[in-house]
Amino acid sequence: MPSETPHVASSALPPYHVATLYERPDLLNLHQETGGSAWPEFMLHDPVAVANWGKMMSYFAGDQLSLLVGDKIAAVVNMVPLKVDADFGKLPDTGVDWGVEKSVSDHEAGIRPNALMGLQIVVAKEFRGKKFSGIATREVIAHARRHKLEFVVLPVRPNEKHLYPLIPMADYIHWKNPQGLPFDSWLRVHKRLGGDMISICHKSMIIPGTVGEWGDWTGQSFPGSGRYIVPFALNPIDIDLERDRGLYVEPNVWVVHHVTV
C-alpha cells in the first residue's frame, strides 16, 4: 500500500508525528527493537511470524508506523492489509497466524484488501502511561480510512490476562471494572474507540520448542511433564519430557472496528 505523509498531532495530544517504514527505512532497526522490547522471549519464536516477517516488512512497509516524539520512537504499529469476509463470525480460530499468512498470500495473488489487521502496538517504556496506546489505535483506524479500507480487525492480546493464566479467556473477557467497562485495560481502549468484541481466537499463535529451548526462553526448569505457568503467558504451557517438546497455544480476542469515511 502507498505511504502517507507524516503529520503532527493536535495540540490536545502529546506532540508526535507519524512515519512509515516506507518513508523512513532508516528507522527499521529501532522500530523492530521497540516492537520486540515488550515481549517475553518465547513470543518471538512463533514459526509462522518468523517465516513471514521479512516479507511483511518488504511488502507492507507503508503499513508499519512509528510514532515519533522528536527523534525518539514513542510507539510502533505493525499491521497488514488483507481481504476479510464481512461476516465476522467466520474469523478463524488461528488469529495472528492466519492473518500473517493470508496477508502475504493475498498480496502475492494480487487480491485487493478491504481491511487492515493489527499485529501489534507497542509503546516504548519511556512513553508508557501517556495515552499512546489509544493514540496508536486511532492512527491504525485513520490509516485504514486514508486507504479506503472498510475494517480494522485485531487479534487482541489482553494486557492483564497473563496475571490470570488459569482463568479461561471466555470468562476473562466478561469481567468488568467498577464503571462497567472491560476489566482489561487493552480491551477498554478498544471499547472506548467503538470496537466490537467478536469472538475468541483460541489458537492465535502456536509456539513449539524443545524442553531446552523453553528453558532458555523462560529461565525456568521443567523437571517433569505437565502444565507450567510461565511469566507473561496467557495460558499454561505443556511440557512433555518424553517427546522433548514444549508447546504454548496463545488465545487472543477478535475485535473489529468499522471504518467510517
How would you label these PLM feature ranges?
Residues 2-94:
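Short amphipathic alpha-helix that is part of the acyltransferase structural core
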Residues 57-60, 245-250:
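A short catalytic or substrate-binding loop motif that flags glycine-/basic-rich loops and adjacent residues
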